[in-house]
Amino acid sequence: MTVVPDVVSLVDVADDSTVSRTVLKGEGARLVLFSFDTGQELSEHTAAVPVLLQALDGLFEITADERTVDLRPGDVIHLGARLPHSVLAKEPGRLLLTMIDSRQLAALKPTH
């Protein structure tokens, strides 16, 4: 078991910037905490593994799969591996990215 207390406090929102910090590398998952100032964005990109996006504070616009949705605190979005997506901060905030290494998880499943 690994505990990351008060994860939101690990990265401050910086003026006119996007900041990222890996806060956990664990078995089957990696957590990256991002902070964004208003108007900052991650242009369209992909991830090699499935990911979960969770807004910790602030408001984000997520575009993927020909859809655009707002991501607010308490919301979670799942994106499949290699799905092109982008992130835009509509207000200052922090976003937690969970990268799920399904290959590693599959290796952990018992075989019968």
Model-assigned labels for residue ranges:
Residues 56-57, 72-73, 91:
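A cytosolic small-molecule/anion-sensing beta-strand core signal
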Residues 66-81:
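Short acidic-glycine-tyrosine-enriched beta hairpin
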Residues 17, 30-47:
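Conserved short histidine dyad/triad with adjacent acidic residue
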Residues 30, 59-61, 68, 84, ...:
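Structural motif
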Residues 81-105:
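Ligand-binding loop in jelly-roll beta-barrel domains
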Residues 1-28, 63, 111-112:
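A short, N-terminal "cap"/entry segment at the start of jelly-roll beta-barrel domains
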Residues 35-37, 47-62:
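Short, conserved beta-strand element in jelly-roll/cupin
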Residues 42-44, 62-63, 79, 84-90:
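Short beta-strand His + acidic residue motifs that chelate non-heme Fe in jelly-roll/DSBH
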